[in-house]
Structures are given as structure tokens and as C-alpha cells.
Amino acid sequence: MTRIKSAVAAGGRRAPHSARLGSASTRTIGAVLAALLMTHDAGAAEPIIGQASVIDGDTIEIAGERVQLNSVDAPEEWQVCLDERGADYRCGKESASALDAFLSASRPTRCEFAGRDRYGRFVGTCFRADGKDVNRWLIESGNAVDRDTDNKGLYASAQQTAKSNGAGIWRAQPEHACAARVGRVNRKPSC
């Protein structure tokens, strides 16, 4: 106690006890937070496996977690497309129904983590129990398009197959879901 008083009396300043501990405490807290963040990221990278419920043509839910199918853009549920005769059909509803039937044929579904989208949803590539790539199938069957801005054309060959076969939305000239969303909600395109 005398030394502290004499240091202050001599014009020196000594940090309070709490401040001296603060730097060690701050380092400890920082290390704990860093460990938690690394654990969280490692946990987020784990695949999700379970029975999938179809939300729409490019979104499913497994065990309460919404999964946006990576590099897939399907028509919105409300979206109407033109068929080969120029007649309207509910392509968004058709896409979601086709996805549900495809997933139901081989359960459970496993989704590999690719990241999170701007809404915080799990973004992944999903596979049926028999190993078939759900994302690729959606595009190859013409029920969705390759969002090539995300994957540098990973599914370009699948999309070309769908176009060549006139499958799904490729029966006529489709309006891409992204463009339809922009027109409906009056926002900037994300594609």
C-alpha cells in the first residue's frame, strides 16, 4: 500500500487492479469466443440428414432447418409459365410437386453444407438415400435452372440436357424465377 501511495506521490501512475486484470481477462474471453465461433462453424459444416419437407421448388426443410438448394433457382410457387402451346400452367407448383415426388422415392435426404444465404438459411447440395444429386436432378428434369452465378456453371450440362429435351419449364421460353420475383415485389435482381 505504501509503495502505491509513494508512486502516485512521485507523479507515477499505476493502473488499478481491475485494469491490470482486464487485459488477461480480455484475452481469455477473446480466446473462449474464438473457440466457440470455430465450434459453431464446424457444427454448421455438418450435413443435415432426415425426412425432407418441400417448401417450394428450391427450398426444403429437414429437422426444422430450412435448406436452400445450392445453385438452383426454381419457379416461385405462385409463378405461371407458358407451355409449348402458349397456355398458362402453374410451373412453380409443378416444380415443388416434382421435387416432393423425387424425394419421396428414396428417403432420407442428406444435405451437405455450402454456406448460408442472405436470409441465414442453410445452403447445400442434397442427395437422396440412393445417392442421386437432388440439385442436379431438379435442373436436368427442367424443374429449375442453374444459378450459374453461384457455381460457375456446375450444372450447365444438366440445364443443357433439359433444354434439349424440352423438359419442364423448357417446354417453351420460361421466365426465370429471379426475373419473376423482381417484377412481383419490385426489387433489384439478385441474379
UniProtKB/Swiss-Prot annotation:
GO biological process per UniProt: polysaccharide biosynthetic process
Annotated coiled-coil segments of the chain: none
CDD domains for the chain: SNc
Pathway: Glycan metabolism; exopolysaccharide biosynthesis
Listed Gene3D superfamilies: 2.40.50.90
Keywords: Exopolysaccharide synthesis, Plasmid
Disordered, as annotated region: 1-21
Transmembrane stretches, start-end: none
Domain of life of the native organism: Bacteria
Entry keyword Chloroplast: no
Protein name: Succinoglycan biosynthesis protein ExoI
Species whose genome carries this gene: Rhizobium meliloti (strain 1021)
Chain's gene name: exoI
